[in-house]
């Protein structure tokens, strides 16, 4: 078998894989049009906010829909025109999977075990789509630590899956919505955790705070900093 030697500098060329999360109404879906040449997989039916962007999308209502969409993205000639895939949202997909498992399995613990296995495989499959940027959005989970601090992280059904989710991605970005000193609402992507908000980036090219423009962020990661 021939060994194929690659260089780490070309990793971004295979696509940047991002998980972003935030509160309802933060504008996670509005990040999709900022991706290079995107197609959306909508499991939430919440694309009205980007209606004017006229983004192509595939409606996901069942696991069969998701599996069919994956095979189309992986194998079809038509999918090659899209540089980015957005799955909105992975939290909602997990809820669909869990409901299906609970219908099939009376043992709740076994159902959650199947959920973890199914979602791990699904996330890896979409994350590893070659030559495509991949964005997955997630809901926000708030928890409290032993010191009484409120912690923020991406949310999934089941404690185990919630804890595993960030490890699948090189980039985990909360979409923050805050008021500035003058009372104006500001939206920004956070790329580094502060002990309260879970965030991470494998790239040294990003600032702690970035504008909510994933195309610009991807260019920075790929060494095309403007």
Outline where the language-model segments fall.
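Conserved P-loop
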Residues: 2-87, 91-96
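Short, well-ordered beta-strand core segments
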Residues: 38-40, 134, 172-174
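Conserved GTP-binding G-domain of TRAFAC-class P-loop NTPases and closely related GTPase folds
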Residues: 142-226
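A general structural signal for short secondary-structure junctions and capping/turn motifs
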Residues: 10, 30-32, 126, 162-166, ...
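Structured loop/turn residues at beta-strand edges in well-structured enzyme cores
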Residues: 33, 80, 129-130, 167
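P-loop NTPase motor core
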Residues: 84, 89-164
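Alpha-helix C-terminal capping segments
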Residues: 31-36, 126-129, 221
């Amino acid at each position: 078998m021939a060994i194929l030697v690659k260089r780490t500098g070309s990793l971004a060329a295979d696509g940047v894989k991002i998980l972003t999360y935030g509160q309802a109404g933060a504008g996670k879906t509005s990040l999709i049009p900022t991706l290079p040449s995107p197609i959306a997989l909508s499991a939430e039916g919440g694309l009205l906010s980007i209606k004017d962007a006229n983004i192509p999308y595939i409606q996901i209502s069942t696991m069969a829909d998701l599996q069919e969409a994956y095979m189309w993205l992986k194998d079809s000639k038509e999918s090659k025109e899209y540089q980015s895939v957005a799955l909105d949202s992975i939290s909602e997909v997990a809820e669909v999977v869990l409901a299906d498992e609970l219908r099939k399995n009376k043992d709740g613990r076994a159902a959650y075990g199947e959920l973890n296995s199914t979602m791990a495989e699904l996330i890896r499959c979409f994350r590893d789509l070659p030559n495509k940027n991949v964005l997955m959005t997630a809901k926000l989970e708030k928890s409290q630590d032993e010191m009484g601090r409120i912690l923020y992280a991406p949310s999934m059904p089941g404690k185990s899956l919630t804890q595993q989710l960030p490890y699948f991605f090189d980039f985990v970005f909360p979409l923050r919505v805050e008021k500035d000193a003058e009372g104006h609402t500001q939206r920004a992507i956070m790329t580094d955790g502060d002990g309260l908000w879970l965030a991470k980036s494998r790239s040294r090219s990003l600032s702690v705070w970035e504008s909510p423009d994933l195309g610009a962020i991807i260019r920075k990661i790929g060494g095309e900093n403007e």
